[in-house]
Amino acid sequence: MRNVLLGILKSYSHKAILQARSQLSLTQAQMADRLSMDTRSYVYLEHGETCCSTLTLALFLIYCCPDPVKFLKELRTAFQTTRKAAA
């Protein structure tokens, strides 16, 4: 179950990060700077090749996400739906 939830987080955060960068009109390097990571690591994250760390997720929610509450509510719904389906 943990790997399934991690996959949901990876997919959901990847889409939200792409959308936020577009809304903020930032380059990949600028977005990486806001998330305190190097550009190469950010590119991997943006392409969904890696999952964000707890620190990266927190920085994203604080400095980049246009609506952190909405992000977390939708992520919670996705997690709950997955858990119910597995039960």
Where are the regions that the model predicts?
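Short, charged recognition helix plus adjacent turn
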Residues: L5-G7, Y44, C51, V69-A87
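Short acidic alpha-helix initiation/capping motifs at coil-to-helix transition points
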Residues: S11-Y12, T50-C52
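Short basic helix-loop element that most often maps to the first helix and adjoining turn
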Residues: K15-M31, L59, K84-A85
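Short alpha-helical DNA-recognition segment
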Residues: S25-Y44
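DNA major-groove recognition helix of helix-turn-helix/homeodomain DNA-binding modules
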Residues: S53-K73
